[in-house]
Curated annotation (Swiss-Prot):
One of its GO terms (biological process) is midbody abscission. Residues 552-565, 665-694 have a biased composition (Low complexity). The keyword Nucleotide-binding applies. Residues 536-565, 665-695 are annotated as: Disordered. Belongs to the TRAFAC class dynamin-like GTPase superfamily. Dynamin/Fzo/YdjA family. Involved in cytokinesis. May hydrolyze GTP. This is Dynamin-like protein B. Keywords: Cell cycle, Cell division, Cytoplasm, GTP-binding, Hydrolase, Motor protein, Nucleotide-binding. InterPro entries: Dynamin_N, G_DYNAMIN_dom, P-loop_NTPase. Residues 43-340 form the Dynamin-type G domain. Disruption phenotype: Produced cells are larger and a large amount of them contains more than 2 nuclei. Residues 276-279 are annotated as: G5 motif. Its main location: cytoplasm.
Amino acid sequence: MDRQSVVKSTAIPFPLNFDNEKYDDMYKAYNKIMVLARDLNAFIETPEFVFIGKDGNGKSALIESFIGFPMMIGEGSSLRPLHITLMNNARCEEPIVTFKRDRSLDSYEFDRQIELSMVSSEISKRNQKTSIPIEITIEYRYYLNMLLIEPPSVSIQPTNAITIQGQSMTSPANQLANKIAKLSIGNEMGEMITQYTKSNNRTLVFVETSTNGGTNSSEMLELAKKLDYKLDRSIFVFNKFHSLLTGDQPFTNGRDANRFLGSPSIGAPTFFTTLPSTAQRSQCNSKDQLSQLCDQLQQTDLNILEQLQFDKKYERNVGLSAFRHWISEFTWRKYLDSVPEVLKRLNSFRTTSEDQLYQIRQQLERTNAVTLRQIANSYVSIEFIQCIEKLVTRTLEGNPSLNGQTLEEEKSQDETGDWYDHNGKPILLLNDEKLVTFYDNKLYGGQQFERLLTEFKCITEVIQLEELSISEVACAIGSNRPSNASVIAWAASDLAQKKIKEALLPLVDQLFKRATYILRRLVDIVDRMIENKKKSSFRRHGNSTSLFQDNSSPSSQSQSQSSSISQSASLSSENMIYGIQSINGSDSVSRPSHENTIVNVEDHPYFIYSVKEMYFKYVDQIAADCKNKCMDEFYTTRLIYWDLQSNKDLKKFCTDSPCVSLNNSLNNNNKSTTPGNNNNNNNNNSNNNYNNSNHILNPKETHTMVTELASKLFQDIRNRMSKNIMLKCYNYFLIPMQMDLKLNIQDNITKLSDAMLEEIFEIQTTKERLREDEQHLAQICNQFIQQEENYKKYSQSFSHPFPSAVRN
């Protein structure tokens, strides 16, 4: 029924009957606006109303009359809070009532749809004392979305009439109870009221019985001032107004009526209603019957006031229709304030998608060999190689706690493992492992390489000369008689060189295997460094032109649009976002500094793979060159350590040997038998020495002498060779990684032909994908344009509602 047929109010600009079918266009427009807002992930706050009142004041009757359908909600019979959600649904010609699942009770684990006539009985079944609310959803095409909350009824007594027992008087609930007057049902009700009223977006509807004392004696007013001290979100409804007009002390004239209706003590919207009793509502079988009954009661009150000649300005405060229209307009204005925000968001998405479409078209135009070569050179020289050089020298950008490796973690990899000797037995440092620098710290790059060399040095120091067999000594001496130091030196030198080669060659192989692994794993760290640089750039330049960067974009809402937008987002490479000319070379979104060179790995996987392959080949090449340099230490001609001939230790060793002692004794005997032949002795001095040196040692003596001398030579050669190998690893492995890597890879990129560049960048596939994405984005742009036009039309219909008959 049209409101104008009941109340001729001029205070409300657009008087809406909440469920008036004459405003069908307005409700259709509202439905379209809400659907689009949901697709755009635009938050629109739903108005919420909390009805607070005592038993018997008509709170449940007010809610039922406001909803507009007879449901026989029991007055004061609810022990639980009641949440009634009114939801607009354009497909519901008749209201659909759904009770949400109630896990606090058995056998109510699922949602249930019931008839309007069964609402009261269903509430009675669930009516058990608990703070968990009964949730009801009513869908109807002539509703605006809102939430009606009815806590259990309160009973207020004078402040000195009751004292709360058994609870701490300092608790928030008791403090509230003391301030607002004692609640007879205890602190539990005080906490519940506080919980439901503390949200600022909720409107509080205080329901009370009309009395002769007027609003000055209102019990709810003091409660309202404590819950909402400004009363800027409070509404007062004084029910049973007809009983006051026709009671024992009725108004005698219009002045008394005006004084009562215009009481200034409240300062908040106030309404005086007469609602159908429970018996009257039970006789209503339809919406129209309930509406006619409410209108008759309202008209009766207005007729009495007319007889008293009351001021017409108070007419807007009398009757259920006035209250309903105030709530309707309040809700309508709430949604009306959200219309520009949704339009702004829609316009933002449209603009963003158009910018993306423009950038993709720029990509297609500038997809050529020149641009590709610029991208390749920029990425290789500024990003990839720069990160490698930082890791080889020193940097914290690689996040050592995440990407670094301890010595144990490094050895646990399949490409590395423990150290093994030439017999395949593991070489363990045991307690000497602590001699390895930073053995328990996470390292990468150059620092990890240096730790490897330190470990190699410790491992070589553990290596000792194995026991030499008599056969090996005999073969080393050959046909020469071991009668002097030079023969022994030759044999010991030869054995030491062969044994050191046998012992160190496996270690050198393992050294370069692990060194290659350390440098090859840097590419994974570089990928993470570049990714972190992208994330930091996103944070610095949050206002990107990319549609997909907005987490609340419609791509995540509407299934019809999600696939298109997500595909268009994937194609709009982050190169565009960072302004790298990633195929498009657009300067419109360029950023300063080195961030212009960031390339999205996902956009050009084969190019990135090719760069990594160039790096791997370079690492393998310098590893092979360095290893050849180290092998020069082993590939020597047969030589003797001539310094042994003049070495004091060797001379002492030969002097103390058994053969020399024997020769000396023979010489002394000759001297004693021929004492007078001094000249002969002097002349034969050299001959005696010759005989001494040519004395033939037995195999055991020879083995002992050669073994001891070879062991000493083994240690000297081992120390010298390990030191030289470490120096060559620095000079021919680590330093080229710092100095020559950029030139090598840059040269390889420069030598690539245009055809090879297009193949590496998959230019044909990229163009096909860009064309597909261009079509998708063009379609999305058209959809946004169409939606924007429709939204403007819907917002116009919603902002200026008129009955359909008037519009026609």
